[in-house]
Amino acid sequence: MQEEFGRNLTYGLQNMLGRAIVVGEYADRPFPSEADIIKAHGISRSVTREAIKMLTAKGLLSARPKQGTFVRPQEAWNLFDPDVLQWLFECKMSLDLLRQFNELRLGVEPEAAALAAKRATPAQHDAIDEGLRWMVDAQRGRYDMLKADIAFHVAVLRASNNAFFVQFRDMVATALHVSIRLTNHVAGGTANIGEHAAVRDAIVAGDAALARTSMRDLIHSALVLMERANEPERT
């Protein structure tokens, strides 16, 4: 039991059941009852109920009185939840899903960059610049490119000083773990430092229109790389 779920039994059970739901394990059979889960994994009733409660809050499950617990359709899932998004990318990863995510980024990050150009503080400028420096270091083998790229994009979201845009940070970070690995692989293991620098420069200069355009160009480049990665699947 401890080995199966790690040190936190509730989160371990949540992750196991969440992945099973996302991969479609219960598409053709009922979701197990509370008693069945307890028996199968040797865990307490309180741990089981808490894990199911967490999955219900994420939109994956629905409990009906005297009928049991059911898996909800995918359109009901909270795709903005980092756990749900991670399970989707881990268990059901597809280029189409990544493409949809980057299309969402086109509607969020350019506007966040424009707001950052108007509102960012000197400290937030420094955070964006630090992310860019880490990317340069990563190209020289002195830092992790994935962490650097995520740090840059999260810093821009925070610099928007808009609470709603900032809420996208965990979702963006989670999905970029997959997206950046794919696009950097297609690009030969490098990120486009120049396009990231253009975003940074526009924000520091206070040019909202240029910041918006530069971020849009950066994300569009990622979409182009995804299309290149998709070419072998079409042949």
Where are these regions (language model features)?
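All-alpha effector-binding/dimerization core of bacterial HTH-type transcriptional repressors
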Residues: 78-155, 194-217
